[in-house]
Amino acid sequence: MKLVLGNGLVNLSWEYMLSFSILLYFIFTQLIFVFEDHSLAKNLKVIPSEVINALFDNFNKNLNFDKYAYVQYATDFDYLNLAIINFIVLRRSSTKIPNLVVLFNRALQEDKNRFDGLRDLSLRYSVTLKPIPIIENVNAESPTWSKSFTKFHIFNEVKYDRIVYFDADSMLLHTQWNDNSSIVNNESNVPENLDELFTIPEIIDIALPQAYWLTKHTKASGKIKAPDGKGYQDEITALINEISKSVNDSLVFEKLPSLLVQSQKSNHRNNFFATHVMVVKPSNEIFNELKKYVHNPWLWSLHKRHALRNKSDYDMEVLNKFIDNVLQENENFKVGILPHKVYGVLTGEFRELSHESFVSEAQFLPFITGELNEQWRPIEIIRNIKLIHFSDSPIPKPWEGMNNFHFYNKFRIYCHDAGFDADLFNSLFPTSWKPRLTTDCDSVNIWNWIMAEYQKLHNELWMV
């Protein structure tokens, strides 16, 4: 039937129907309830440090090191210098990995005077500098962090089978400490490498530590308790014995512990993982998808409303959203949780008043209690740390310089023991912004030592 007079009305009704359909779609995608994915336990596993070391001892001789790489990235000269310093330390640690790659902002090459000095330094230690375009979102809330998405270029390095990545504002540590909180001084006191991370099960697409400092504690803490020290070690020993008998990569992954409750992950969709150290399996597909998570193209946004980037979202939040979505959508995507007490430590942890979240194992993090703070033994802890991330805001990073007069000194710590000298303390910090006094002098000594260790490297290798 042909409606001539009503044609305008018919067209109008179709426009209303189309608009109404689009509106319903947006409401649905915004309000849809995401049910807990019961397959999470199969695809998200905790990798205890003891297991990582056992895998390395058993399988490192079979690795093709030429297909592996350590990678860092840098968007400015300071971080380029830091990345090169870290890789010089790695070379000194006798790493077996030949490929040390710094992905850097290609615009830095335009400042020939500064760039040439860093290029020459990198050549001396066989460090590869690879220029890349910046990944930036101009709508980001903070210009300081807007270029952090450049980190995602590591996923595009598909010439390598596996990459161990860590932020340039990190430092490798050595672990030989005396019980009196003094460093053992001998020629072998070179920081250890992270080569063992290349031997985690190949089936794992990405492995990261948990952002332990952001963990929310669950009300179930009174009902579920982590095993005591001996009980946990017995479980780990049994696990290692099982894994040592497995030659199948999938079976090894299957035997790894899961989170105690899956809500531990769902309660931290945007900040469960820390991204300052990662083990990744490079993939063009993942790289291209992450760029969409950064820039939110309109067609992609239509079916990814829950993944849209907020102005305050940067590399950590974006990667967490991506991992969360892929774990729900792809049953073949495998994720490992690295031990934060070895690879994910923040320097600021030594200034904290309480350490319950830090001392807990990853799978027990939501169920921590105040009693765990008794397990904070700084000397034992520093002996196990292999990589530490400089994070003490508002205290400046050590290469930015600090003094004893500014407001941030009130966030520092100072030893208050039997030998405390009040006159010396007041002369060192003459303003009202004084460090917090603490009887945890081991933590004070370790924090100061970390800063001093960085300064030694700075004095030797800083070029810019």
Swiss-Prot record:
This protein's GO CC annotations: Golgi membrane; vacuolar membrane
Localization (cell): Golgi apparatus membrane; Vacuole membrane
UniProt entry tagged with the keyword Glycoprotein: yes
Family that this chain belongs to: Belongs to the GNT1 family.
UniProt short sequence motif DXD, positions renumbered to this chain: 167-169
Bilayer topology term: Single-pass type II membrane protein
Location, primary (coarse class): Golgi
EC number from the UniProt entry: 2.4.1.-
Residue positions the entry lists as glycosylated: 180, 186, 248, 310
Domain of life: Eukaryota
Underlying gene: GNT1
UniProt keywords, alphabetically: Glycoprotein, Golgi apparatus, Membrane, Signal-anchor, Transferase, Transmembrane, Transmembrane helix, Vacuole
Protein name: Glucose N-acetyltransferase 1
Bilayer-spanning residue ranges: 15-35
Lumenal side, ranges: 36-464
Protein's job: N-acetylglucosaminyltransferase involved in the Golgi-specific modification of N-linked glycans.
Cytoplasmic compartment spans: 1-14
Gene3D superfamilies in alphabetical order: Spore Coat Polysaccharide Biosynthesis Protein SpsA, Chain A
Recorded GO MF terms: transferase activity
Signal peptide (from-to): none
